[in-house]
UniProtKB/Swiss-Prot annotation:
Pfam families: PP_kinase, PP_kinase_C, PP_kinase_C_1, PP_kinase_N. The active site is at H431 (phosphohistidine intermediate). InterPro entries: PP_kinase, PP_kinase_C_1, PP_kinase_middle, PP_kinase_middle_dom_sf, PPK_C_dom2, PPK_N_dom, PPK_N_dom_sf. It comes from Helicobacter pylori (strain J99 / ATCC 700824) (Campylobacter pylori J99). Its cofactor is Mg(2+). This is Polyphosphate kinase. ATP binds at N42, Y464, R558, H586.
Length: 675
């Protein structure tokens, strides 16, 4: 018997749970639409990175197998098979929601169903807003098929010259920055691509439009950097980002159009692909013909529309922790260590702490890591302001996938302001979230530390669940300062910390040691691990051994889980759960009954434990330990948003009509009570 679930199929099962939220009839309609948008965006990234990586392995005949022993070719086939039915489910769900929205006055209307007045408005919109932005190409001997960037959305048309009667083909690129949903009347929307299609004869004068289809390509978007050759890492990353859009096509999505037109499109795509693709004749590319609009990720436009608030869940306003009501946050932290649970407790104190430090004349230095900060960052702006007055040292991780460009921008801005900027660490990704502020008062140095499971990004802090920790303890600050020094001197793999634990050297051995300790207590042992993913085979094997010793193990794994639970003789004492709700579960909390409870930036994956700089923080303060344990206990009682994984790899939603509990709703209400 194989002891592990396949990683890729486990991720797809997570995205299925996202799709299930779109099917939840208890949710407002735009909330359901939101989950369809998330589903599609997730799948885009899965193809850009995971499927693209498998294709590279397959095409280069690299004998690399998944944790379950499946070859790249086998995994690609399993992915295609898994999605074949689910893509149809997604289309049906969209059509159901679309019909329900129509009854509520929000209409996504096909162009051919518009009346004459609405078509006139669409024509005006085309002339004033779209005509100058679309890029039409007539494909002939002097105009070959142009390269397509990742996530290109375009129309492919069969056209005929009215005078010569000669037929040819045309490509019309639609820019990504245009509004997809065009509001012609209050609540009535037409799709931009359908408006363009209806006016193709204005782009190709004296031509008849014989056939047309919308299509979208997804390309390999991973960035391969040879760090050994990097003299200027920022410059190398900048050049690599420019190449991201030139990757091989891994997925083609089409809508409408004849089979003959699709064949011609495939032949045209083949004409500019690399030798590898010509050799394989595009057989590795996954092709999906859609009965609905392409790219449901654009549904965010409707979800965020200001006129339809009644069709969404009420916005929750994160609450300020009562201990932070004082004007001087540093005094608050000096009194006691504090733990916040975002988004239920506001992220504002984190921003305020940096802003207060920047304006405080007693502040000597700020040291901080930045992983994903977003395009509009009040935190970076505060650091830029501080850099003109005090010592500011920032490690900006340029390898944060899909945030590389934003991070590079902020790194350059910080450098211009006078901050010391370090662009990551050689062959490691710095994923630890840490901040230490040093002040001088009464002729003494005082250190204030902030550590978190989540990013320094106020926007994601409103939709991700994370814990963040504030302390004025010297032993914690000393460890963080030591870690910063090791990052600056590229000795992160050789240093060890005294109070905290860091990857790649300390976290994995520590977790194994903690599992072994619970094994010594046999049936009295108890482990709860909450993480985003569980993939590391060594950790899984130790959990199997602990189960066989009688240790009870509850795993709350949001996404990928390669461990097989409830297998007799292997893992019958292990239960695996997943919570999918309005907030993305992102905190990592690790509880060991006979030792301690920890929180961490690290998931239980080889990349986190072996190839990243991460932190594992013990909760030595009893109040904080109890708060972390309370989070786990409530989530293990969830009967509305919690799924359980069985030994066959299937997830079933847990339901108890007599005791309904949505853990995320519970924490919202609990935050209100603390005021």
């Amino acid at each position: 018997m194989n002891r592990f679930f396949n990683r890729e199929l486990s991720w797809l099962a997570f995205n299925t749970r996202v799709l299930n939220e779109a099917k939840d009839e208890s949710l407002p309609l735009l909330e359901r639409l939101k989950f369809l948008a998330i589903y599609d965006t997730n799948l885009d990234e899965f193809y850009m990175i995971r499927v693209a990586g498998l294709k590279q392995l397959y095409e280069h005949k690299i004998a690399s197998k998944g944790i379950d022993g499946a070859s790249p070719e086998e995994q690609l086939e399993k992915i295609k098979h898994y999605l074949a039915h689910e893509i149809e489910e997604r289309e049906l769900e969209f059509q159901k929601i679309q019909a329900l929205l129509f009854k509520k006055g929000l209409c996504i209307t096909p162009y051919n169903e518009l009346n004459l007045e609405q078509k006139a408005k669409a024509k005006t919109y085309f002339k004033e807003q779209l005509y100058a932005l679309v890029l039409p190409f007539k494909l002939d001997s002097s105009h070959t098929f142009p390269p397509l960037a990742n996530l290109t959305f375009a129309l492919f048309a069969h056209i005929k010259d009215k005078e010569t009667q000669s037929a040819s083909y045309a490509l019309i690129k639609l820019p990504s920055f245009i509004f997809r949903f065009v509001e012609l009347e209050k609540g009535l929307f037409a799709l931009a691509e359908e408006i363009v299609e209806a006016h193709l004869e204005e782009l190709f004068l004296e031509h008849e439009i014989l056939d047309c289809m919308a299509f979208r390509v997804t390309c390999d978007a991973d960035i391969a950097i040879t760090e050994d050759e990097a003299h200027d890492y920022a410059d190398l990353m900048s050049k690599s980002l420019r190449k991201r859009n030139q990757g091989e096509i891994v997925r083609l999505q089409t809508q409408k159009g004849s089979q003959e037109l699709l064949k011609t499109l495939l032949a045209s795509l083949r004409s500019f692909q690399t030798h590898s693709y010509k050799k394989h004749k595009l057989t590795g590319m996954h092709i999906y013909k859609s009965a609905i609009m392409l790219n449901l990720g654009d549904l965010w436009e409707l979800v965020n529309h200001s006129d339809f608030k009644a069709l969404k869940s009420p916005n929750f306003t994160p609450k300020i922790h009562p201990h932070f009501n004082e004007n001087d946050l540093f005094k608050s932290i000096e009194k006691q260590d504090l733990l916040l649970f975002h988004p239920y407790e506001s992220f504002e104190p984190v921003i305020d702490l940096i802003e207060q430090a920047a304006s405080d004349p007693t502040t000597l230095s700020i040291k901080m890591t930045l992983y994903r900060v977003g395009k509009h960052s009040p935190i970076v702006k505060a650091l830029i302001e501080a850099a003109s007055k005090i010592q500011v040292s920032v490690l900006v991780e340029l390898k944060a996938r899909f945030d590389e460009e934003s991070n590079l921008h902020w790194a350059k801005a910080l450098e211009r302001a006078g901050a010391l900027v370090v662009y990551g660490v050689f062959k490691l990704k710095v994923h630890a979230k840490m901040l230490v502020i040093t002040k001088k008062t009464d002729n003494q140095l005082r250190h204030f530390t902030h550590l978190s499971t989540g990013n320094y990004n106020p926007l994601s802090a409103k939709i991700y669940t994370d814990v963040s920790f504030f302390s004025a303890k010297n032993e914690i600050a000393n460890d963080i300062i030591k870690l910063f020094h090791s990052l600056l001197t590229s000795s992160a793999t050789s240093n060890t910390l005294e109070t905290l634990f860091m990857a790649p050297k300390q976290i994995k051995p520590k977790i194994i040691e903690l599992i072994q300790n619970e094994m010594n207590h046999k049936q009295e042992g108890y482990i709860i691990l909450k993480a985003n993913a569980l993939v590391d085979s060594e950790i899984i094997e130790w959990l199997y051994q602990a189960s066989q010793k009688g240790v009870k193990i509850d795993l709350i794994i949001r996404g990928i889980c390669c461990l097989k639970p409830q297998v007799k003789g292997l893992s019958e004492n292990i239960r695996v759960y997943s919570i999918v709700g309005k907030y993305l579960e992102h905190a990592r909390i690790y509880y060991f009954k006979h030792e301690n409870i920890y929180f961490s930036s690290a998931d239980l994956m080889p990349r986190n434990l072996e190839r990243r700089v991460e932190l594992l923080i013990p909760a030595t303060n009893p109040k904080i330990a109890n708060k972390l344990l309370h989070i786990l206990e409530i989530q293990l009682k969830d009967t509305l948003k919690r799924y359980e994984l069985n030994s066959k790899g299937r997830y079933a939603k847990i339901s108890n009509p007599n005791d309904p509990l949505n853990s995320q709703d519970y924490f919202e209400k609990q935050a209100l009570k603390t005021l």
